[in-house]
Curated annotation (Swiss-Prot):
Coiled coil: none annotated. It comes from Saccharolobus solfataricus (strain ATCC 35092 / DSM 1617 / JCM 11322 / P2). SUPFAM superfamilies: Ribosomal protein S2. Residues 7-23 have a biased composition (Basic and acidic residues). This is Small ribosomal subunit protein uS2. InterPro entries: Ribosomal_uS2, Ribosomal_uS2_arc, Ribosomal_uS2_CS, Ribosomal_uS2_euk/arc, Ribosomal_uS2_flav_dom_sf. GO terms for cellular component: cytosolic small ribosomal subunit. It holds the Pfam family Ribosomal_S2. Belongs to the universal ribosomal protein uS2 family. HAMAP family: Ribosomal_uS2_A (MF_00291_A). Keywords: Ribonucleoprotein, Ribosomal protein. One of its GO terms (biological process) is translation. The lineage of its organism: Archaea, Thermoproteota, Thermoprotei, Sulfolobales, Sulfolobaceae. The gene is rps2. GO terms for molecular function: structural constituent of ribosome.
Length: 231
């Protein structure tokens, strides 16, 4: 599916100085840390760009606030949560993982993630009762749910919470995290950001499962995870 005429949060306004980039390559104690993705790659995709509002739940993931009020996420914490989420999700049978996306820019990343990992993808509107009504033809029983945006994937979240399914979510600075069990702070609105996030998470899950070596890469490039635009 291709998308056009949609407002995308581009990777503008979140530029960092070289000193700040260098700081993000180090732990709080000053030691160089090895990220899943180089700092410059994270930044060029805009994974760190938040919104102009921040809920109390997301404050601990903020790196700084720009003069115009834009909240900027800490890529070290994004990276850390990607690792934690990958380790957690790798414990499940792939077919028991459902990944959902109501926001169009997340459709292709979610579908490619499911293809690579072996999980199941649900994009677009979630039919009420999908997780709760066994009489529906669309009824499924996942063991864990991965959502692209708590603000738009509300139907899936409510149903998963009702039946006790653990929920992992990509959450921007404006997110309300009711029912979310594991947060991955990130720009979940940008096309390039979503592609990189789902690609990095898929790769790390395969590493955790030992499908690929600890330093192995996916056969599928990040570009294949990116939602295509109509010219």
């Amino acid at each position: 599916m291709k998308v056009t005429n949609l407002s995308e949060k581009e990777e503008r306004g979140g530029e960092l100085t070289e000193a700040e980039k260098e700081e993000l390559r180090k732990s709080e104690k000053g030691a160089i840390i090895e990220l899943l993705v180089p700092v410059d790659t994270y930044l060029s995709a805009g994974v760190h760009i938040g919104t102009h509002s921040c809920t109390k739940y997301m404050e601990s993931f903020v790196y700084r606030v720009r003069a115009e009020g834009l909240y900027v996420l800490d890529v070290r914490k994004i990276d850390e949560r990607l690792r934690i989420a990958a380790k957690f999700l790798s414990r499940y049978d792939p077919q028991d993982i459902i990944v959902v996306a109501s926001r169009p820019y997340a459709y292709r990343p979610v579908q490619k993630f499911a293809e690579v990992v072996g999980s199941r993808a649900l994009v677009g509107r979630i039919i009420p009762g999908t997780f709760t009504n066994p009489y529906l033809s669309t009824y499924i029983e996942p063991k864990v749910l991965l959502v692209s945006d708590p603000r738009t994937d509300t139907q899936a979240i409510k149903e998963a919470a009702k039946v006790g399914i653990p929920i992992v979510a990509f959450a921007d600075t404006d997110a309300k995290i009711d029912y979310i069990d594991l947060i991955i702070p990130a720009n979940n609105k940008g096309r390039k950001s979503l592609a990189l996030l789902y690609w990095a998470l898929a790769r790390q899950i395969l590493r955790e499962r030992r499908v690929i070596p600890p330093d192995g890469d996916l056969a599928v490039p990040v570009s294949e995870f990116e939602m295509r635009l109509v010219q």
